[in-house]
């Protein structure tokens, strides 16, 4: 078995999701906050996007081996649902279109996942945020392409030809809040053209892999 295929509910506890060493598994994990998306008109609702590290993966998703962008995904081949916060759950066989997806081992009712068609899925979270997942190109993985907040404000997530996240835009104005630049498969810098209402100037940092 490849380390990328290791799955256990033990990794869904908060001690593993937060930065540090999980005393139960002995595994180290780390999260680096990249951006926090907030709507203009709703308080106390936000979506934090992190770079997350797991020693159990040998994949390089553009940020170095073991690092991934913390976005919700659904692998329709392995039936693995991965939440933005790091939790993973196995789905039962996908239902017909326009039906809710069921999970083998998930008991909490803090979200519901619906299959619109073979390429599009909706994740309804308890905090009111709706995530739209789509399969991009020939990929088996449906990725987050939109985040809709309770007041209807939407952030669109745009991917490049290599299926890597390249921009996050605010749908109403078209403003870019996050831009990721790549050299080949590797992300080389991250830009904040608008900085999510906090600063009018651009900011950026470079990644050394």
How should each PLM-predicted stretch be described?
Residues 1-209:
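Surface-exposed recognition patches
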């Amino acid at each position: 078995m490849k380390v990328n295929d290791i799955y256990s509910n033990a990794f869904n506890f908060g001690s593993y999701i937060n930065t540090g060493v999980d005393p139960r598994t002995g595994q180290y994990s780390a999260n680096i906050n990249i951006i926090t998306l907030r709507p203009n008109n709703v308080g106390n609702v936000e979506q934090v996007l992190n770079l997350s590290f797991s020693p159990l993966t040998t994949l390089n998703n553009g940020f170095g081996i073991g690092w991934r962008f913390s976005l919700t995904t659904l692998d329709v081949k392995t039936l693995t649902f991965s939440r933005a916060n790091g939790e993973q759950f196995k789905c039962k066989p996908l239902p017909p279109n326009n039906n809710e997806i069921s999970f083998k081992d998930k008991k909490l009712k803090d979200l519901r996942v619906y299959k619109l068609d073979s390429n599009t899925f909706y994740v309804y979270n308890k905090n009111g945020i709706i995530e739209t997942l789509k399969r991009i190109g020939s990929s088996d993985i449906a990725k987050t392409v939109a985040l809709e907040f309770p007041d209807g404000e939407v952030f669109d997530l745009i991917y490049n030809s290599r299926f890597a996240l390249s921009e996050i835009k605010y749908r109403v104005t078209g403003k870019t809040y996050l831009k990721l630049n790549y050299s080949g498969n590797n992300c080389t810098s991250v830009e904040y053209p608008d900085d999510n209402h906090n600063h009018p100037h651009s900011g950026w940092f470079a990644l050394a892999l």
